[in-house]
């Protein structure tokens, strides 16, 4: 039995001038999602999706490469200005933001939406090195 040929879906070009970038930077990886104002995903990328493995995913350079890739995908849809929402304690926060500026986006606002507990769950134990 022959396999059916899988169809490649081509992304239709959406004309969206402004959007929101969600930068989720953890200790292990950096995920970047660009959405429209309603929250529908336009483009996404992560350090792991760019081929970085293991401890290299958590580096600022990996976050920069992921942000540049995501920005190019969003520019194909006609996006020019961005609001930035940064979440998490990771090392790729600032480098991802700088990469978005270097690609040529106009950044209108930067918000830190990292959740801070009002003495909620017990934190994990301290590392002793």
From Swiss-Prot:
GO terms for cellular component: ribonucleoprotein complex; ribosome. The keyword Ribosomal protein applies. The keyword RNA-binding applies. One of its GO terms (biological process) is translation. Keywords: Ribonucleoprotein, Ribosomal protein, RNA-binding, rRNA-binding. It comes from the Bacteria. InterPro entries: Ribosomal_uS11 (IPR001971), Ribosomal_uS11_bac-type (IPR019981), Ribosomal_uS11_CS (IPR018102), Ribosomal_uS11_sf (IPR036967). Signal peptide: none annotated. GO terms for molecular function: rRNA binding; structural constituent of ribosome. Transmembrane segments: none annotated. Belongs to the universal ribosomal protein uS11 family. Part of the 30S ribosomal subunit. Interacts with proteins S7 and S18. Binds to IF-3. Located on the platform of the 30S subunit, it bridges several disparate RNA helices of the 16S rRNA. Forms part of the Shine-Dalgarno cleft in the 70S ribosome. This is Small ribosomal subunit protein uS11. It comes from Bartonella henselae (strain ATCC 49882 / DSM 28221 / CCUG 30454 / Houston 1). The gene is rpsK.
């Amino acid at each position: 039995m022959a396999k059916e040929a899988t169809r490649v879906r081509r992304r239709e070009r959406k004309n969206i001038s402004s959007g929101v970038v969600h930068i989720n930077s953890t200790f292990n990886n950096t995920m970047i999602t660009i959405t429209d104002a309603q929250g529908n995903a336009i483009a996404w990328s992560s350090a792991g999706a760019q081929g970085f493995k293991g401890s290299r995913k958590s580096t600022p350079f990996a976050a920069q490469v992921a942000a540049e890739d995501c920005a190019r995908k969003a520019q194909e849809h006609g996006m020019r200005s961005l609001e930035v929402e940064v979440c998490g304690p990771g090392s790729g926060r600032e480098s991802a933001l700088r990469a978005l500026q270097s690609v040529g986006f106009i950044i209108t606002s930067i918000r830190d939406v990292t959740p801070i507990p009002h003495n909620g769950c017990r934190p994990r134990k301290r590392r002793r090195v």
